[in-house]
Amino acid sequence: MRKLSFLFAVAPIVVKVSAFTPEVYVQAEQLPRLLYILPAPPAFDSPEFAADEVRYNWGKVQRQDSARLAVAVADAEWDNLEVVLNRWQEAFGMPISEVETPQIYALLVNAIATVDPMRVEPKAFYHRQRPFERYEDTMPSHEEPFLRGEGSYPSGHSLRGWLIGLVLAQVAPERAEAIYARSWDYCNSRVIVGAHWQSDVDNSRTAASVGFGVLQNSNRYRAQLIKAQLEYQSKK
């Protein structure tokens, strides 16, 4: 199995996470190409983009709710993977960590490392302007210097966030409703902070589902899933 240093990158963003070395379940060249699956992002003069603008303004209204804004800003974190995964702690019913839940942690980290590269090609190809850039707005999260000039379509946070929900719901199916609800809100946080258009987010959920489907055909993924399920049952 090929080992990777843990990097999620579409320049200029590079994030290193812990000493854990992910092992991908499927090689990148075997993954479906999102350029041939997802539609192109809406043109700025299209009815679909008008809907994106409506949702952008919805997001700005949501910022007026200090509690929801705090959630959206916290959801923007990607520098510490354990912090990220524990955005699902309440929905999942327990904390997730490399030390305390190593099998669950490994399942998630390896799944993300496998599927996340799918977004790189369409991001570079479309290089879609982000909402905060188009409207010369200021983002409420810390990401603005890193995101400026980097394509918005599809959304990496949303792809990973929806994938995390899909995987955790396999581990703990009795908590699926809460897990999916958390993932849905996590993805929408990207609209609220002005990092992404709604169409970025919606198509990223589809992209995550495509990647999740690929994982189901991996013997290594299925074997690790069983370990994670047993660990979950022993700790709940």
List the predicted regions and their residue ranges.
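Positively charged n-region of N-terminal signal peptides that target proteins for export
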Residues: M1-K3
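Short alpha-helical patches at coil-to-helix transitions and adjacent helical residues
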Residues: H157-W162, V201-A208
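C-terminal subdomain of the subtilisin-like protease fold in secreted/lumenal serine endopeptidases
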Residues: N203-R205, V210-G211, Q216-K236
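Hydrophobic alpha-helical bundle signature of multipass membrane enzymes
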Residues: F20-V193, N217, Q224, Q233
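Short acidic/histidine-rich active-site segments
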Residues: H196-S199
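N-terminal signal peptide c-region/cleavage motif recognized by signal peptidases
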Residues: P12-K16
